Amino acid sequence: MTAAHTRILELRAELDQHNYRYHVLDEPSIPDAEYDRLFHELKALEAEHPDLVTRDSPTQRVGSAALSAFTQVKHDIPMLSLGNAFDETTMLEFDRRVTEGLDLPVGDLFGGGAAVEYSCEPKLDGLAVSLLYQDGELVRGATRGDGTTGEDISVNIRTVRNIPLKLHGSGWPATLEVRGEVFMSKAGFERLNASQLEVGGKTFANPRNAAAGSLRQLDSKITASRPLEFCCYGVTTDISDTHIGNLQQLKKWGMPISHELKLAKGIQDCLDYYRDIGERRNSLPYEIDGVVFKVNSIASQRELGFRAREPRWAIAHKFPAMEELTELLDVEFQVGRTGAVTPVARLKPVKVAGVTVSNATLHNMDEVARLGLMIGDTVIIRRAGDVIPQVVSVVPERRPENARAVQIPESCPVCGSHVERTQLVKRSKGKETVSEGAVYRCVGRLACGAQLKQAIIHFVSRRAMDIDGLGDKTIEQLVDEKLIGSPADLYTLKYEQIIDLEGFADISSKKLITAIENSKTPTLARFIYALGIPDVGEETAKVLARSLASLERVQKALPEVLTYLPDVGLEVAHEIHSFFEDSHNQDVIGALLSPQACGLQLQDQGELSAEFAASTTLGGLLDKLHVPSVGPGAAQKLADKFVTLEGVIKADWLDMRQALPEKQAKAVREFFDNADNANHALAIEQQLKDFGMHWDSEKKVVEGLPEAGHTWVLTGSLELMSRDVAKDKLESLGAKVAGSVSAKTHCVVAGPGAGSKLAKASELGLKVLDEEAFVAFLAKHNIPV
């Protein structure tokens, strides 16, 4: 090894150590001038010996040639969002759920129960990122994106000075994924804006926007010039048995963690921490919008698991939003995907929490009435959750004499169609109650440009039909040029029509045609979600597809039958039923599925879910009818006494009295004396028979499936299918798919990148399948891949 090479290695090690002491320990050991001298010495030596330059050298943070675009990165483990709390009541409820979920005794606020230990740290207002280390070296940085897919920002991440390019010490896993927040301090933000003003550049509204904009620069040299910092808040591979232990170990390896990190013993400690940080919020060197609390025990986190898009073991306690006074200049109306006509406040521009606000949500006309809002009023504006501006209240003493009432338009501001007022109806326990509220809708449907654009945007989105290349602006062009009038028209678009659109050339036009063609075989769940049924999100669409397993059954299902599905209440069930009853929607769906028109072919259709089919009983059906005064217990007594629905309907008063007290017996008799009620009950029963899920039907039950009673765990990435698809296939065999490994786990499917779950499975001696073996297992049970 030459003297120059030796000196280069010495300088790198020394500079790395100084970086660590400065950025992580906050204990600088040398003056800045001495650091600069060492840095420039290293830079000069590397210039003389370019063959000795390595990616992990401190000099390589300065940026490189500009990129044309960021590439997408799929997160092996999704970067989930957190549930929010805006008051102490919600925090207490969160603690209660955690305590009950861990089967601990629930005590009062100040003691008497088993206090859960929580980690506490400020919620930085920046951009969430993932850092991937291989053998201790930083190999990739990615944004959170939508939680599943982000952008590869590796070149820019390497310019953030307190992110170690190589981990310190030893003992780190071969693959380590660290997660945290890239942010800009208040002082750094002020310096950046001052320098931008000096050169006539664009200034930023707040540190978060500055951090996000800087990190997503295609030219990494610009990113390198910005005062960005990183703070680690988690890791995907457990390296300790507690969350705080994980962070402390990461700190030893060179990762900056929050100086405010603290362990709280019980919810009262959490509330005290929140109040303390809130009082010191303005004096902190960075902006925060709340505090994050996490169950500290990793084992407890695994036991609590996840729901939909967030962990059950963590919550963000947000600070109250900041408020300002301004003038309401006007109220305009916008039209949404479902035709709802909603008011939007146009405001005299005012800065709220560092952001200039000129528009604010008013939700609906009921909100306008509740506020007593008039055009010309002075209003209080709040950034709810520090994000969405909203009008909180009116200052009545400042109302001018010429203030005007807010009037809902009689015709749609977009298409001119009639605006219809529909009274809101609440359904609870079989009763329909007309509420004071109302919704205003444009009756133009897809003839209304606003509704059509929003419907198409939703239809083609990544989690729906996933048609790449159809951005919002392209959809606006297609609608404005009258090239499409419904989602079905997308499938009749020709190359000659697309190439004439702004922003399209030969290759991009052909790519769009191919993307549209490739979308013709969606899964049933994606198709249901793409239809844009009110109140039906991605998870509900998956439940509908997994349980009913055919579009025909979903279309025909009565509301009471739909309520057998997990997490589908009567309100949502009525929305689903009403959507498919609508003749206009039937026409659009018919065109999409017609071989002569669009020719979509839905995948994953088949037999009714065995678990769903086995979920019905006569007592359960009687309970779903919501007979006044009759709850689940009384319904089961009727089922035990009369055995059949027809027997209940035809039972006379004396027979009824043998099963129930007088008041309940009278209520049941009066209910079924109404022919509409009796006929509706029989119609529900007939549908249960038609679907093969009647309690007397010969049907497959979950216990008869090959993997019934077995718990499986999926970890790592799979190449031939997503983990969601793998989960669906296992559940179709009767298996339960869990998020954590335990002694009760039957089998673990481990793909590339499998971490602690695979290690735990090996430790417990559990059966482990790689993807090839898993595919063979599915084939054995005639499950296609």
UniProtKB/Swiss-Prot annotation:
Which residues hold NAD(+)?
Answer: D32, A33, E34, Y35, D36, S81, L82, E121, R144, E181, K294, K318
Q: Which GO terms describe its cellular component?
A: cytosol
Q: Which cofactor does it need?
A: Mg(2+); Mn(2+)
Looking up Pfam families in the UniProt record yields: BRCT, DNA_ligase_aden, DNA_ligase_OB, HHH_2, HHH_5, Nlig-Ia
Q: Where is the active site?
A: K123 (n6-amp-lysine intermediate)
Q: Which superkingdom, per the lineage?
A: Bacteria
Enzyme category, top tier: ligase
Molecular function in Gene Ontology = DNA binding; DNA ligase (NAD+) activity; metal ion binding
- Please give the catalytic activity noted in the UniProt record: NAD(+) + (deoxyribonucleotide)n-3'-hydroxyl + 5'-phospho-(deoxyribonucleotide)m = (deoxyribonucleotide)n+m + AMP + beta-nicotinamide D-nucleotide
Per the UniProt record, which EC number(s) apply here? 6.5.1.2
Q: InterPro entries annotated for this entry?
A: BRCT_dom (IPR001357), BRCT_dom_sf (IPR036420), DisA/LigA_HHH (IPR041663), DNA_ligase (IPR001679), DNA_ligase_AS (IPR018239), DNA_ligase_CS (IPR033136), DNAligase_adenylation (IPR013839), DNAligase_N (IPR013840)
* Residues that bind Zn(2+): C412, C415, C442, C448
Q: Name one GO biological process term.
A: DNA replication
Q: Which SMART domains match?
A: BRCT, HhH1, LIGANc
* Residue intervals of the BRCT domain: 702-785
Keyword entries, A-Z: DNA damage, DNA repair, DNA replication, Ligase, Magnesium, Manganese, Metal-binding, NAD, Zinc
The Swiss-Prot or TrEMBL record describes its family as follows: Belongs to the NAD-dependent DNA ligase family. LigA subfamily.
UniProt function note: DNA ligase that catalyzes the formation of phosphodiester linkages between 5'-phosphoryl and 3'-hydroxyl groups in double-stranded DNA using NAD as a coenzyme and as the energy source for the reaction. It is essential for DNA replication and repair of damaged DNA.
Annotated NCBIfam families: dnlj (TIGR00575), PRK07956.1 (NF005932)
| Name this polypeptide is given | DNA ligase
